[in-house]
Curated annotation (Swiss-Prot):
Gene3D superfamilies assigned: 3.40.1370.10
Gene Ontology MF, one: structural constituent of ribosome
Subunit details: Part of the 50S ribosomal subunit.
Record organism: Syntrophobacter fumaroxidans (strain DSM 10017 / MPOB)
Phylogenetic placement of the source organism: Bacteria, Pseudomonadati, Thermodesulfobacteriota, Syntrophobacteria, Syntrophobacterales
Keywords assigned: Ribonucleoprotein, Ribosomal protein, RNA-binding, rRNA-binding
Name of a matching Pfam family: Ribosomal_L4
Protein name (record): Large ribosomal subunit protein uL4
BP GO terms, sorted: translation
Amino acid sequence: MPTVDIFNTNRDVVGQLELSDAVFAVPLRPHVLHEVVLYQLAKRRAGTVKTKGRSDVAGGGKKPWRQKGTGRARAGTSRSPIWRGGGTIHGPQPRDYEMRIPKKVRRLAVKMALSQKLIDRELTVLDQLQLEQIKTRDFAAILDRFELSKTLVVIAQPDEKLQKSARNIPNVKVLRTEGLNVYDLLNHRSVLLTRETIGKIEETLGS
C-alpha cells in the first residue's frame, strides 16, 4: 500500500497517508489512456462544419455559353468546382465524432493516470487548502512554495475563494472530484490534492 507525505501550506510535513492500492497502484496500460483521451477530445467536437458542394451553391442553373462554336472550353454550369465561386470538392460535412467506451474503462484510465502521477512524484497532498480571502497572490505563493507549475488542483467541495484566486494564474486549473478526468491529469505536470479529496476519490473509484 503506497504512502505519501502530507504537507501544510508552508511545506512542512505534518503526517503520512496510506493510499488505496485499488486507486493509486494500478499498472499502466498506455493504450487504455490513449483511447480514453481520444474519447474525451472527440466528445468536445461539435461536428457541425460544412462546405457547399456544386449542388448547394446558389446560381449556376444556366449553361454559361453554347456547347460549340465559341472556341472556349465546354461548360455546363458556372458553379463547377474548378470555377471561382463554384462548389467545393470533398469538403468537410457534418458528422458525429462520438466514441463509445465503457464506464469501467474510463474509471480504470483515471486510476492509471493517478497511479502514474504518484510514481513520477507529481502528486502533492495537503492537509487542507483554505484561503482566508480571494487573493491570487496568496494562492500563487503556495504554488511557488511547492515549486509547482502547470498544476491541476482537485477539491472535494466547492470553494469560491480558491477557485477565484486560481483562475487568473496561467496553467492552473481547479476541478471538483466529480470532474476528475484523464485528459486533465495527463495535460498537467503536477496534481495538488487534499486529504479530504483523496478520501472522496478513493470512495468513488475504489469500489
